[in-house]
Amino acid sequence: MDELAAVTEIAAPDVGANQHRWLIAIAVMLGTGREMVDTSIVNVALPHMQGSFSASVDEITWVVTSYLVANGIMIPLTGWISARFGRKRYFLFSVTTFVIASACCGAAQSLDQMVIFRLLQGFAGAAMLPSSQAIMMETFPPEEQQLAMATWSMGLMVAPVLGPTLGGWITDNWSWRWNFYINVPIGILAILMVYTFLEDPDYLRPKRGAKVDYLGIGMLVMGLGLLQLVCDRGQRAVQIWLVERRHSQS
């Protein structure tokens, strides 16, 4: 019986020992909330961005498409990357990269620059959603996990709803560029809080030397990227093909 208890204790993660758990919750929700807001905040600013970059309606939609494609590629890889490099380290890297990419998006001088920086922003932001959920479950004891996850879920549901309203207000009163600059101070606060209070659980450390399936990762990235691209832009391609076919038959 004692041996079984010992094995169970080793196998199960040490959950709920962190006395700063609500500060950690605020930190991860700051990062994740900004990522969720950014999925919708730029939609209302697209006409203003279109004028700044002298882009067509079809071209400016790549600002949204690039972000969604990068998100779709990176989300499935988050668990493996967290296990290999550490959840705290990866989350800090993601938030830091997201902040830098946001500042670059705000300073972009062409559509090409904006699309590249939005790709970088999407790659970085993708890690925050699954990582923050895992961090919440590992930080809170079992008796508080339901409350913690309810709070986390509420924040994630509110963030995309606030995005268009906040984006419209910022664009009208300041500039569309501030839809990205606003991420910088919030992101820096999240970085400082995560660095100060968050620690990796012990059960993740033995997994950092695992073998890497580079072929599998490459196929996953290619497949998910193309699938996301088809889902987002496929209808447009079909419409163009139908128009060209109609002209060729007439």
PLM segments and residue spans:
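Transmembrane-helix bundle of Major Facilitator Superfamily
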Residues: 2-197
